[in-house]
Regions:
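Central regulatory/effector-binding core of bacterial HTH transcription factors
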Residues: 38-98, 249-250
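C-terminal effector-binding regulatory domain of bacterial HTH transcription factors
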Residues: 67, 189-194, 198, 207-250
């Protein structure tokens, strides 16, 4: 049989007060996330972006805000902000992140690079027929990011065995191998920016090929109101704006 639950007269009398109390409790719990300014900022991003872009610049943020301790979580996994204890993230994608605050940081493109010593061994495209090709097999690749086979075909360069060479599962390892003179790499320009500016890497061709993915700052709306997140967001927007205006050629 179906039985309905009915409040007693005493329960009916208490109901308005209980509803108000639960509403206040919900509001207080929701406010805790906004008020959590412990001084520890946890940021998630891809390993290669952390190693090649963020780390060289992180001292700037620390000098501006010494009271904020930054914890970098390097992972390709999409974080669950509440469950993983992450305040904000830098994501490589198309910018479609429903329910999150999203800021476009940087576009990305790809260009062949090598060490200055290797470049001195010959001129492209002949050089590509003689050197080891370095391949990026990382999950950071997107469908619009060319492989060596795709790039060589688009450039009209033949006589190069596009399948040979060394393979790595992280973009930063590809760049480190190129810096060490192990071969030529198809480098993401944003990741290789510091190495190109410093002369550790040089371009083999002037033309870079844009890719569909870019880099985005994301965080939950409640996190965006926190001082530590707001300061990091403002800082990285300034850094990426300056970076986009600074040439990455050598």
């Amino acid at each position: 049989t179906n039985r309905a639950l009915l409040l007693t007269d005493e329960g009916q009398a208490l109901l308005p007060g209980l509803a108000e109390a639960f509403a206040l409790m919900h509001h207080a719990l929701a406010s805790l996330e906004t008020l959590d300014d412990t001084g520890v900022l946890t940021v998630s991003m891809a390993p290669s972006f952390a190693a090649k872009w963020l780390v060289p610049r992180l001292e700037s943020f620390q000098s501006l805000h010494p009271d904020i301790d930054v914890r970098v979580t390097a992972s390709m996994n999409l974080v669950a902000f509440a469950d993983d204890g992450v305040d904000c993230a830098i994501r490589y994608g198309l910018g479609q992140y429903p329910g999150l605050v999203v800021d476009k940081l940087l576009d990305e493109s790809v260009v062949p690079v090598c060490s200055p010593a290797l470049r001195g061994m010959g001129a492209p495209p002949d050089l590509l027929r003689d050197v080891t090709l370095l391949h990026d097999d990382s999950p950071e690749q997107d469908a619009s990011c060319p492989t060596w086979r795709m790039w060589l075909k688009a450039a009209g360069i033949d006589g190069v065995d596009a399948g040979r060479g060394l393979h790595f599962n992280q973009a930063s390892l590809v760049l480190e191998a190129a810096i060490a003179g192990r071969g030529a790499a198809l480098a993401k320009v944003q990741l290789a920016g510091e190495d190109l500016r410093s002369g550790r890497l040089v371009r083999l061709f002037d033309v870079s090929q844009p890719v569909a993915f870019g880099y985005y700052f994301v965080c939950p709306p409640a996190k965006a109101a926190q001082r530590k997140v707001a300061l990091f967001r403002d800082w990285i927007l300034r850094e990426t704006k300056a970076d986009a205006a600074y040439p990455k050629k050598n």
